[in-house]
């Protein structure tokens, strides 16, 4: 047991955190009625004894009105007693983007934890802009793509997704371009990371 971080057992209990995160992610009772966290998985833990514990959670969230569900990743850091509020206040001064689900920044005082909703991140300040660019393939000029495959090709479709995310450390996105050369009825896929 870490006397500086007595909340460790709770923040590593996915069922307890599913309920705690549900209350913290959605501000209003109507939003909590509309969205349910169906599953909470821990995808990463980094622990510094007597100092802090970083935990990343993957949530499966369902909109009960539409039946649609989606994934939201939260990366949080638990602090010794009394240290989460100053960290939350400091993080609140940064420009944050609205995530797909819930609030961009969450403070859970009952477990002395501050969480950032992906694509917001405590250390990677440019991640929101970078992940938006990866998902919005219109930011990659077709001429750039075509310069790499030669003349006569056309971009017919693009798909992007985040392939790997390690909170406070790295994020890798993949973009695939579907290409066609109509003169030879040839297709090709170009993938970049």
Spell out what each predicted region is.
Residues 1-193:
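Phosphate/pyrophosphate-binding loops and the adjoining catalytic core of nucleotide-dependent enzymes
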